[in-house]
Amino acid sequence: MAIERTFSIIKPDATRRNLTGAVNAVIETAGLRIVAQKRILMTKAQAETFYAVHSARPFFGDLVSFMTSGPVVVQVLEAENAVAKYREVMGATNPANAAEGTIRKLLAESIEANSAHGSDSVENAAVEIAQFFSGNEIVG
């Protein structure tokens, strides 16, 4: 099986509570390598572009506001089946439905403030990675 890359965001609810290390520990324990990482303040334009697929949804404005409410940590993760593996490690979007030991079960505050984003496909991962990283910033 080929090595894949996926994109991750540690969301403002987690960074506000200084949980970056806790999230990274779950990621690395699951066998995903962090090959790029930076802490940023996402701009409104970045958030609107990133979540454009949800622009017609009623929660879009709140999502953009939340994602720009504090620092986020954007990451590139690498492993065999990285996309599926990270989605499993994150857990269900609603932390109440997330499996034990997942990021969202352990750390999320709510369905909105669920601590982590992960790409849903290899194709979307490539697009999402390119929005935040240049090639020389990925050092896997």
Swiss-Prot record:
The keyword Ribonucleoprotein does not apply. One of its GO terms (biological process) is CTP biosynthetic process. Its cofactor is Mg(2+). It comes from the Bacteria. It is an enzyme of class 2 (transferase). ATP binds at residues 11, 59, 87, 93, 104, 114. The active site is at residue 117. One of its GO terms (cellular component) is cytoplasm. Pfam families: NDK. Belongs to the NDK family. Homotetramer. This is Nucleoside diphosphate kinase. It comes from Xanthobacter autotrophicus (strain ATCC BAA-1158 / Py2). The gene is ndk.
